[in-house]
């Protein structure tokens, strides 16, 4: 796992994220084409897997393969993925993310990301699940249980 630098971001929202079923904090970051993509643009009426990641990490390819399998199986049932990269190397990230079928955005603040701090992300990868109503219902601690977690809210 990759540690995230601590920040003096909103302590109130951090406490809310620790609770179950809070509304999500919208995120708007640039995608591989430089267009800003909002989390809310993919979340309407969908179950969303939010992933804070670093493509340069050794665990990233295997995790993205797992996400690809889940996306293939459950996208037509309402699953979306919103993946936030904290990679510092823009070109590496663009090359790695350009062929992924889900929303891939990058926070140029890298490990100093205020967005990651607001979601109380202390290390990568960090995975959250939103239900169809936009409630943050799960912080995934075990990737092996990710499919069951997704199925429980689809």
Regions found by a protein language model. Give the residues of each.
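Structural microenvironment flanking redox-active thiols in thiol-disulfide oxidoreductases
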Residues: 61-98, 111-115
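Loop/turn elements at helix/coil->beta-strand transitions in domains of secreted/extracellular proteins
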Residues: 44-47, 77-79, 100-101
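Short acidic-hydrophobic, aromatic-tinged amphipathic segments that line or gate anion-handling sites
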Residues: 103-108, 140
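Single conserved hydrophobic/aromatic residue that forms the stacking wall/gate
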Residues: 1-9, 13
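N-terminal "domain-start" segment that seeds a small globular fold
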Residues: 11-40
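Short active-site neighborhood of thiol/selenol oxidoreductases, capturing the structured segment around
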Residues: 39-61, 67
